[in-house]
């Protein structure tokens, strides 16, 4: 009797859809890379399922990268910018990032759907060209993703230019209000045990950064770090904010440098870890994972060591930590976002890492 092979894709309740399955070490490897490995192992259906799940991993990005640019420009107008100034700023951005990026992710999304479907079909046909087709789909998605990130980051830069750096935290609060409410309801200690929340947060990390195509090879690879009281996920760099700072994956043109000049913080702010040189796009990670959950739940849900831009030294890697007990989060994490460590919940040792 043969031992059943564990599925590589199955329904994930916390995401409400299918997602990758496996050990954390397996999940730290990019989805496209893993699909190609399955082709080489003649696990054709597994390869096809992985290609198909890459579309689901990318879907949330398709949604927000479609919505955020328009919402940002409206917010800029609502905060006093003239239409002439907005139009001039948008025209400048278009000159920098090009018409395909300015047209938006929705216009390009069908191309990726078609590429992924073609790759999955070749896998099921057991075609020797399947591996090449999977890589072709990855390249299609990388181009679409990166152009969409340029558009979002460029719109955020417009907000900084026309409304001011000090308003950046409020802008991200506006853009992510729906996420905040879901985050608060789900991860409250009164809603479910932290062990369950920690697992869900980790699932969301690997799922999301596969889609961001983290890493210099842009495969979505993540470095897994296991420590006694926390688990870390390092992106070197992530494919969104970290890419804005990294010359190695932007053909020598990081978006925070010339000619783009996308904004980084020039003053300390609670919503940017009170650190100068934080990419304006990366601010949303501080708000969503640290500032907002501390304010609403009493503890961060994920603790981030962010990338930073500097004239002499730039750090492009980013590490997200999930603590096995939120009571173990250090005082310094609270203080660097201007919060009181007294908000921290009491230790709950029964919520051991699962």
Which stretches of residues belong to each language-model region?
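N-terminal accessory segment detector
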Residues: 2-283, 288, 294-317, 324-354
């Amino acid at each position: 009797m043969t031992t059943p092979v564990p599925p590589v894709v199955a329904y994930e309740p916390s995401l409400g859809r299918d997602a990758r399955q496996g050990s954390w070490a397996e999940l730290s490897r990019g989805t496209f890379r893993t699909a190609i490995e399955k082709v080489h192992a003649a696990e054709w259906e597994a390869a096809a399922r992985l290609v198909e799940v890459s579309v689901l991993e990318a879907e949330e990005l398709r949604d927000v990268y479609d919505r955020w640019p328009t919402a940002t420009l409206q917010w800029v107008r609502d905060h006093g910018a003239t239409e002439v100034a907005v139009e001039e700023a948008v025209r400048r951005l278009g000159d920098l990032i090009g018409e395909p990026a300015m047209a938006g992710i929705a216009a390009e999304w069908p191309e990726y759907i078609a590429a992924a479907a073609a790759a999955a079909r070749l896998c099921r046909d057991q075609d020797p060209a399947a591996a090449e087709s999977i890589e072709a789909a990855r390249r299609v998605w990388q181009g679409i993703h990166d152009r969409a990130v340029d558009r979002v980051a460029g719109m955020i830069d417009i907000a900084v230019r026309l409304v001011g750096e000090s308003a950046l935290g409020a802008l991200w609060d506006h853009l992510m209000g729906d996420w905040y409410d879901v985050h608060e309801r789900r991860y409250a200690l009164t809603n479910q045990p932290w062990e369950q929340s920690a697992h869900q947060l980790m699932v969301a990390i690997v799922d999301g950064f596969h889609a961001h195509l983290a890493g210099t090879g842009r495969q979505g690879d993540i470095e897994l770090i296991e420590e006694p009281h926390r688990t870390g996920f390092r992106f070197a760099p992530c494919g969104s904010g970290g890419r804005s700072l990294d010359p190695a994956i932007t053909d020598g043109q990081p978006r925070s440098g010339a000619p783009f000049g996308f904004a980084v913080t020039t003053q300390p702010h609670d919503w940017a870890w009170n650190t100068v040189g934080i990419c304006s796009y990366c601010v949303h990670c501080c708000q969503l994972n640290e500032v907002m959950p501390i304010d609403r739940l009493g503890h961060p849900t994920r603790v981030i060591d962010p990338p930073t831009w500097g004239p002499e030294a730039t750090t492009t890697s980013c590490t997200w930590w999930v603590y096995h007990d939120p009571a173990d989060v250090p005082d310094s994490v609270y203080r660097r976002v201007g919060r009181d460590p007294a908000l921290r919940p009491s230790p709950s040792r029964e919520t051991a890492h699962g």
